Amino acid sequence: MNSTMQALFVRYKNALTAAGFFALALAFRLWHLGTPKGFIFDEVYYAKNAHSLLLHGVELDNGKAEFIVHPPVGKWLIAMGIKIFGFNEFGWRFSSALVGSISIVLIYFVAQRLFNNYYLSCLTALLTLLDGLHLVHSRTALLDIFLMFFLLLSFYFILLSKHWLAGFTLGFALATKWTGIYYLAAFFAFMIYVDYRQEKAMENLTPIKSTLQNKFFIRSTQFILIPVVTYVTTWMGWFLTPNGWDRNHSKNPLLSLWYYHTQMWQFHTNLTDKHSYQSN
């Protein structure tokens, strides 16, 4: 078998394997997806927020004892399922099941890049497919499965040296949950370290300081500027309506958004109430 035929065979084998994992994962996640009935844990917030996004383009400030404390991207994804299947248990959980299933395929290809071994990649995907925590988050309308997907996709783009795309997906991760910022910082620091090691390996063929300064600027654009711009852009529905939380705090919408974010920050840093779902 010549190299061209071998490459084609590997490509088709990977495609068929990925399709098989996706079909199996989706079957596991869609089976009785509408059960249990009613809202599970924070579905009571996210499903309703997603429905509000679908109807009004923004999570409305309705004056009730409720505060929207997470960015909108994950809830927009939940809204897609509601748009297709209606405001019911299956509808608000569908996007989680779909994205969770796609993430199994993504994990397979990440493992291929890391191990370059078909069987290890299959084992990695299979273990994730059967993992209880992944399965539960793929069957509930919570934000964590979307956060995981965007972070994993960012890592995959880094493995492919598509750093600009990694920046965009990190922005979407941050716009799903703020905890994405820790991974953004880690990826940024990792790329700075990689650049430094590569320049050291060049044995001073070019001035290291000048080259590193240029690369630092590029990495800052890829892993700071692009994620921030992407993050702010995801709030477009909030910008385009007067009914969002704190939207009218200032005549300058950016100042209103900043104020809203300070309120969100205070909520997260001062939250001390206990609940029956928390871990020990």
Task: Label the model's feature ranges.
Residues 2-241:
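Membrane-integral, polyisoprenol-dependent glycosyltransferases
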Residues 216-280:
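Membrane-lumen/periplasm interface segments of specific transmembrane helices
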